[in-house]
Amino acid sequence: MKRITIKELAERLGLSPSTVSRALAGDRNIRRETRERVSRLAGELGYRPNPVAVNLRSGRSNTVGVIVPEMVTPFAATVIGGIQRVLYGRGLKVIIAQSDENPQTECGNLELMERFMVDGVIACPCDATRNGEIYRRIRQRGVPLVFYDRAPLRVDASRVIVDDFATSYFLMEHLVRRGCRRIVHLGGPAHIPNARERLRGFRYALGKFGFVSDGRSVIPAGVTFDD
């Protein structure tokens, strides 16, 4: 279905595009009869404002972009739900884009957020060594940026992350105190900082509690359910 534009509305009504635009915005300097004519025809033809054009005029989108690596785990669902509750409660809209643990997809999603002129970005990067340039560009443009769970290297931005080293160490300590002796670490990909820190905590605990680290104590794994 063809999208109806302000220009087409103006031609049908015999008005200038600027008058139609102001009438649709409820400008009281436009006669009430004119505003009603414009509103009536816009409704009949199914006119919908172009969000990008509206954002350009106002300089704001009242929208926050959220970049996630996946949306199937309980952790991801909890985080997304929390973000939505907080932002919706403040009158903001949310655009969620999944990178599927692919840096190229993540880059495309970030470029999409730029085109939509989002007022902020919340992201969980899939690779700490990739897409730093576009994240820095977003920051340089003055767009608020917050990383959660993971953060890329050399990008100065707010972050909400877990101390994975300490968490891994204390988990090992708990298992040792419960009498466990054959403990195996399922390690994630090395390009994910969380995975590196968890492995570091595991190995530190092995040494502290007198375990001998051999090739069988660490099993490489991915980040999906299939892995």
Describe each model-derived feature in a short phrase.
Residues 75-76, 105, 130, 156, ...:
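Secondary-structure boundary/capping motif
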Residues 129-139:
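Active-site-adjacent beta->alpha loops and helix N-cap segments on the catalytic face
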Residues 36, 45-123, 200-203, 207:
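Amphipathic helical "hinge" segments at domain boundaries
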Residues 99, 125-128, 150, 187:
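Short secondary-structure boundary segments
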Residues 12, 17-22, 57-72, 174, ...:
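Short beta-strand segments enriched in small/hydrophobic residues
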Residues 1-62, 200:
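N-terminal helix-turn-helix DNA-binding module of bacterial transcription factors
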